[in-house]
Amino acid sequence: LRSFDNDLRSAVQDGMIHHGVEIINNTEDVSIAKTDTGVAVTVNSKDGKSVILADVVSLAALGRKPNTANLGLENVDVKTHNGAILVNADSQTSVENIYSVGDCTDNIQLTPVAINEGRAFADTMFGNKPRTMNYADIPTAIFTTPEAATVGLTEEEAREMHGDAVKVYRSSFRPMYYVLPNKQEKTLMKLVVDPTTNRVVGAHMVGDHAAEIIQGVAIAVKMGATKADF
C-alpha cells in the first residue's frame, strides 16, 4: 500500500494484526524452497533472523502487468512502457488511428476508470460530444480486513502541494454495530483540508463498508465540498 495515506496503512495493519494476521516488517529477502509436502517460505529480516512462514503452500502477490506481449504492437510502432500502451489525454496511442483504453494502458487500473475511458472515447469519436477522462479524485477501495478506501490526496501529497499548513482531521471510533456485542473493532475517518480554501482535498477511511461509503464522499470531494460541509 505504498501509494496510500500513512494513517490508512497503519490502520489496515493494526486491523489485520487484530484479526490474527502476522505481519513481518523490515525484511531483506524472501526465499521459497520445494519440500516433500509443498513449499517452504522463509523470510530473512535485517537483524539476521529467519522465519518460516509456510511449509505447505505459498501465495505470491507480486503485482501484474498488461498482457500486451503478443499483440504485435511493435509491428505498427505503438509505443509502450513496461508493457503498458502509452496514450494521450484522448486515449490515442503513438499511432494516429489506434486508440487504447483500460488496464493495458499506463493509466489507473480500475474497472470504473476503464468503463469511463471507453465512454469518453465513444462520445468523442462517434457521439459528437468530445470529452477527456478526468483522473482527479477517483475513489479507490482495498478489500482487506478491515476494508479501506480513499479519494483525493494523501496527507503527504497535500503537504507537498499546499505546504505544512494543511489541516488534518482524524476520528478513530468503535461503530455502534460493535458496541452491544462488545467487539473491539475500530473505524478510522480522516479528512485532509486545504488551509486556504478549507476545501477537502482528500478523504480516507478504514472500517466496515468503506468501499461503499467512499463513493458518496467522493462526490462531495469532486464538487469542492469544504470541511464545514462535512
What are these regions (language model features)?
Residues E22, K79, D164-K167:
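Conserved beta-strand segments of alpha/beta enzyme cores
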Residues I52-G127:
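FAD-site-proximal beta/loop scaffold in flavoenzymes
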Residues G20, L86, L191-V193:
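Conserved N-terminal phosphate-binding loop of PLP-dependent enzymes in the Aspartate aminotransferase
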Residues F126-G127, F143-T154, R159-F230:
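Flexible, glycine-rich terminal cap/loop adjacent to redox cofactors
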Residues S45, N88-A89, D194-P195:
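Short, acidic, Ser/Thr-enriched surface-loop or helix-capping motifs
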Residues S31, D77, D90, K190-V192:
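Short, surface-exposed charged micro-motifs
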Residues L1-N44, G48-K49, N107-I115, D123-E157:
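Rossmann-like dinucleotide-binding cores of NAD(P)H-dependent redox enzymes
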